[in-house]
Amino acid sequence: MDLNNRLSEDETLEQAYDIFLELAVDNLDPADVILFNLQFEERGGAELHDPAEDWAEHVDFDLNPDFFAEVLIGLGEADGEPITDVFARVLICREKDHKLCHILWKE
């Protein structure tokens, strides 16, 4: 993989959020979809992190943080606060030529 061909942090967040929006209705409880849509402007956010260690239970490849990121999407207590109600954890490959993502949805 090429370090010079990676998505920026903003591009990674945007791509993960777009994927979340496309798939949320099919994977979240309808009440959670309504809550997220009503509260996102006031309390919503997406946070970029290195992949958590528990992803190893879900995927069978090396999660080098130079090429993979975890994006938490959900609601915080207030605008700008850390996300406390996680609706999705998106594992995404940051290499532009390698489209790959996995999502763990709120249960």
Curated annotation (Swiss-Prot):
InterPro entries: dsDNA_mimic_put, Put_dsDNA_mimic_sf. Pfam families: DUF440. Gene3D superfamilies: dsDNA mimic, putative. This is Putative double-stranded DNA mimic protein ETA_15890. SUPFAM superfamilies: Putative dsDNA mimic. May act as a double-stranded DNA (dsDNA) mimic. Probably regulates the activity of a dsDNA-binding protein. Belongs to the putative dsDNA mimic protein family.
